[in-house]
């Protein structure tokens, strides 16, 4: 699983080449730590021995979070993402979860993909950042 995510992070993260190794290492480390905190199940579709689509179901009591959905661009449009999502929803039901949540960017295509599969928006978040060392005066 980590191989698919690592390829995706290396391809898609908006970070400098100099920082990429450290950022990817931190993300992989985060996944290992998450595995120890909640019940994490990795779900995947393999083709010719290689993971082409994957997601994670994280169960904490009666709530499940579906995260890290990723399909290799060369394997999209073949139903692999649907298979991963369906398996996650089935597993959540088996665990007795009455709620499955996920996050999707309101301006990106996955939001519509999830909506077509029955998910509805229930809230929004606001993401912000500041340059390291910037003061409130210099950030204006």
What are these regions (language model features)?
Residues 1-64:
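Flexible, substrate/cofactor-facing loop regions flanked by secondary structure
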Residues 54, 110, 116, 130-140:
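Accessory recognition modules or surfaces
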